[in-house]
A protein has these predicted regions:
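Bacterial N-terminal signal peptides
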Residues: 9-19
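N-terminal leader/linker segments that initiate helical-solenoid repeat arrays
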Residues: 24-75
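Bacterial N-terminal signal peptides that target proteins for export
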Residues: 1-10
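Amphipathic alpha-helical scaffolding segments comprising HEAT/armadillo-like alpha-solenoid repeats
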Residues: 46-59, 78-90, 110-123, 144-168, ...
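Cyclophilin-like peptidyl-prolyl cis-trans isomerases
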Residues: 462, 466, 470-474, 485-722
Length: 722
């Protein structure tokens, strides 16, 4: 997810409050549509094709068809659909059609759709559910507007806040309108929004209180801090308490120190403890240092089994201590962190970063008494365990960011830079390792490259040029990204142009997209011509990126060259996906921590569910680790590389829907629109800012306690779909 959504037809108030452990196949009564029409619609979505075929379905006599076609138009995102969607919103007799039209307009994220949504929002005759989707859509449009449209953005955000205030003052405020209004405020960030959000902290509904606090945290508004300090102590809902801690940390509310410390060490819910630990790190109150070290020690002294659930808290404590003890060389903290280094074999970046922030001198000396010994030790670390090498590289890169006041900063930087240079030269070492399984040392190289680049060494261009020729696509992508960060030059242009033909033949598009981005930064005709060569790519994402970059560089409007997706799916694939609609489909995910069950949502995301089911049936996920765990946010998996960059060798289109990201929602991880493949995530807590941005294709209906216990490094044993 780099990471970094919702359902398909109308949501009633009672269903918005649906528990994540309740059956949630469809949030709106679904009227049947023929298989033939569904396949037509889904094929158009999959191909990202907006044409007369889909346009004609928007005027179909059957409102169910119009609803589904409107959703498809929103997913495709072509501005040419806005006129008809706006017409549906303003004039269709069916409420469900108008709701979906509003949702779809918001998905297009174009200012051209704003007037229709504003009219619906301000209408005195429109239903609250349609107006709720209108306020949601306006929030998306406001968030997507460029800085040049600041005046228009302010107009939209003001209308959003006014509408939310009016709804709050009504005799019976609509639950869904309030929730979607809060998220719209979060996205549009109107002036004085903190006052409105603070009023919602008194709401009787826990979800509304939690979402209001979430919005206050993300906007860093202090208006409700007094109330939030009390909620942190007394609210019965853990999501409210956790979000209260987040706000108090984000706004650096020093008066809340005692309450945050109590929550960090004694709250019964790990999500609250984690949020409070993070908040204490931002307050930078030295009183927290010893208390958190004591708390961390109390966990690690329990002699826990490998990969315990408590690992998540240990890593959060380590991160906090790195901030609180920065440059203080506290021996107690360093000794505790050293135990973590041994336990994780240096593979936890949180521990490595904390250690180097507290004592860069001691960190560097820990790898050897002299530079040659340390260089060889780190080469061996990278070769044997790329995760360890990558984590150490991040820590070495941190030394480049030391305050200028550090007395021996120059010596520390010189030492760290030479160690990173040695790690990049691991192939030239005489270290020979015999291993039955591939070590994939190259997976750690991108972090080493990024760390090395942070020192701005004299040979950086030469080093990046060399790595542009590596076999690993992610290494080449990283080298291209870093070249793009350097001042534009003819030499950089030449290297990037030379690297383009190979990237155009890759199965994965990471390198070519990075090369195109960096070419665009060169701002010269040679680079622009090279970008134009990718307009003929068979990869829709590459063509789309090339068109966007050329437009930004004023090198021409080639929008007509984007075309449609050359999809992998056949008619049989579409029929198989459609056949699951209306049926209960579940996946049992067995991990090293136990099993949890997902109710898949083929009604909402048929092709995403089909892709997941097909991968699972092939055993694709067997043995893959949870490579990313962010407590109180998500657990993420599905990357065969394990570094967050891997996938199945193809991408699928987003099937964004109206299903909200409640606790236990299952979504597709992305690095941009339509970039999903095999990586997916499960949310620990509601994440409304993800709604309408990432495909929700399932919900955990049992075993959420297993999800809560998962840590980075846990493994998938099997996934069975039935």
């Amino acid at each position: 997810m780099q990471i970094r959504v919702k359902s398909l037809i109308t949501i009633t108030i009672c269903l918005v409050a649906l528990s994540p452990l309740t059956s949630a196949q469809s949030l709106r009564p679904r009227r049947s549509i023929s298989t033939a029409i569904l396949v037509r619609i889904i094929r158009a979505e999959d191909e990202r094709r907006w044409d007369g075929n889909l346009l004609s379905l928007l005027t179909n006599r059957d409102p169910a068809v119009r609803v589904r076609a409107a959703l498809a138009a929103g997913r495709i995102g072509n501005e040419g659909s806005l006129a008809e969607l706006s017409n549906l919103l303003g004039h269709d007799e069916d409420q469900a059609v108008r709701e979906m039209a509003a949702f779809a307009i918001g998905e297009v994220e174009s200012l051209s759709g704003a007037n229709a949504l504003l009219a619906a929002l301000k209408s005195s005759t429109e239903t609250r559910l349609v107006r709720a989707r209108a306020i949601e859509g306006l929030g998306k449009i406001a968030a997507a507007l460029p800085k040049e449209q600041q005046a228009r953005s302010a107009e939209i955000s003001t209308a959003i806040l006014e509408a939310l205030n009016l709804e709050m003052q009504s005799q019976s405020p609509n639950h869904q309108f309030i929730l979607l209004g809060i998220t719209a405020v979060l996205r549009s960030r109107p002036a004085n929004a903190g006052q409105t959000l603070t009023l919602l902290l008194d709401n009787k509904d826990a979800r509304i209180r939690a979402d209001a606090a979430n919005a206050l945290a993300r906007t860093r508004a202090k208006d409700g801090n007094n109330k939030l300090a009390n909620l942190l102590e007394s609210d019965p809902d853990p999501d409210v308490r956790a979000n209260a801690a987040r706000v108090l940390g984000a706004t650096e509310e020093k008066s809340a120190f005692e309450k945050l410390l109590a929550s960090a060490t004694h709250d019964e819910d790990a999500r609250v403890r984690v949020s409070a630990i993070r908040a204490l790190a931002t307050l930078k109150d030295p009183r927290a240092s010893e208390a958190l070290l004591k708390y961390g020690t109390s966990i690690t002294e329990r002699h826990l089994k490998p990969l315990p659930a408590e690992q998540n808290e240990v890593l959060e404590v380590a991160t906090a201590l790195g901030r609180l003890y920065a440059m203080k060389a506290d021996s107690g903290a360093l000794d505790w962190l050293h135990e973590g280094q041994v336990e994780f074999d240096h593979s936890a970046p949180e521990v490595e970063l904390a250690y180097v922030r507290i004592s860069p001198d001691r960190y560097l000396s820990s790898f050897g008494s002299d530079q040659a010994t340390a260089q060889r030790a780190l080469q061996e670390k990278l070769i044997l365990n790329w995760r360890s090498g990558a984590s150490i590289a991040q820590a070495l890169g941190e030394i480049a960011n030391l305050p200028t006041a550090v007395e021996n900063k120059s010596d520390l930087m010189s030492s760290a830079e030479s160690l990173l240079r040695a790690m990049l030269n691991y192939k030239s070492s005489d270290i020979k390792i015999k291993s039955i399984l591939p070590l994939h040392t190259e997976y750690g190289v991108p972090e080493v490259l990024r760390a090395y680049a942070s020192y701005k060494p004299k040979d950086l261009v030469e080093v990046l040029s060399t790595h542009l020729e590596e076999d690993d696509v992610v290494v080449r992508a990283t080298a291209a990204d870093l070249l793009g960060d350097l001042p534009a030059s003819q030499e950089n242009t030449r290297m990037l142009v030379a690297a383009l033909p190979r990237a155009q033949k890759d199965n994965l598009n990471d390198a070519i997209l990075s090369i195109l981005d960096s070419l665009a930064k060169q701002k010269n005709s040679v680079a622009n011509e090279a970008i134009k060569s990718s307009l003929d790519s068979t990869d829709y994402l590459v063509r789309r990126r090339a068109v966007a970059l050329l437009k930004t560089n004023s090198a021409g409007n080639f929008s007509s060259r984007i075309g449609t997706v050359h999809t992998r799916n056949t008619n049989a694939d579409y029929k198989r996906a459609v056949a699951r609609i209306g049926k209960r489909v579940r996946a049992v995910v067995t991990t090293t921590k136990g099993s949890f069950t997902i109710e898949l949502l083929p009604d909402e995301a048929p092709l995403t569910v089909d892709n997941f089911a097909e991968l699972a049936s092939r055993g694709y996920y067997r043995g893959i680790t949870f490579h990313r765990v962010v407590p109180n946010f998500v657990v993420q998996l599905g990357d065969p590389r394990g570094d967050g960059s891997g996938g199945p060798g193809y991408t699928i289109r987003c099937e964004v829907n109206e299903v909200p990201y409640d606790r236990g929602a299952v979504g597709m991880a992305l690095s941009g629109k339509d970039t999903g493949g095999s990586q997916w995530f499960v949310t620990h807590a509601p994440q409304p800012h993800l709604d309408g941005g990432y495909t929700v294709f399932g919900r955990v209906v049992s075993g959420m306690n297993v999800v809560d216990s998962i840590v980075r490094g846990d493994i998938i044993r099997s996934i069975t779909v039935r």
